[in-house]
Each structure stands twice: as structure tokens, then as C-alpha cells.
Amino acid sequence: MGKQVTSNGKQFLSKADILGQQDMVMEDLFVPEWDAWVKVKVMTAAERDHFEASTVQREGKKTSLNLQGIRARLCILCLVDEDGHRMFSDEDEYALGTKSGAALDRIFSVAQRINGMRDEDVAALAKNSDGAPAEDSPFD
């Protein structure tokens, strides 16, 4: 079953169309600190949910941001090999976090951009239930 055209000319995707979309964008990035290239990918919705859940900490009505290892956590989800498979597991957070901050910043910036992560998105995550202002964003 393909796209359905309605009487007003709009084309709507079917379930099969949506699930069949090849929408995982990847970008090559040269990292001078390592004198090599890496491949950075867009996260799946599940990976983005995982990243956001690992970034926000809730205690009762209080919400705060967990910035510890944020660069490594995002890079773990977005660094892939040439075939698009993740290179790192969640358990590699500490090890990756010991690498060059400048190198991880480069990768983090590209991952942030291609995943559409804006300061407003993080601020919305950090807001607590009473509408108090969010803490400073880690995505500067």
C-alpha cells in the first residue's frame, strides 16, 4: 500500500511507508585531534528518549539536569561505523569521557545540530512541574 492521494491533493503515508523510510542521516566529520574521520548519525526516537531520560533527574517535584558525561553519552549514541552500527555501548561512557574534550566537543556539536537539539528543547526537559525556570542549558 503506497501513498494515498485525497480529493484535496494531499498525499498521506501508510504505516508501511513510514516504517520503510530511510531517514537515518549520517555525516562524516574530520577530528583533527585524532587526525581521522568519524561518522555521526541522527538518533532514532528511542535513542533520543534514552538520552533525554539520562539527562533529566527528577526527585519528587524537583527536576535538574544531569550534565555529568553528557558529551560522552550523546557521542555514544551518535558515533557509528561505516555501516551505520553503533561503535560504543552505554558502558563505554567513562572510557569515552577520558578522551580529548576538544574532540568530543566537535562530535557533540555535530550530533546536536543533526539531531535538531536546541537550547529550548533542553530547557523544556529541565522545567519542573510548577513551571519554574529551567537551569542553564548544556547545549551552548
What are the language-model segments listed below?
Residues 1-25, 139:
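Extended acidic low-complexity intrinsically disordered regions
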Residues 2-5, 30-140:
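Short, surface-exposed, charged amphipathic helix/loop patches that serve as local interaction elements
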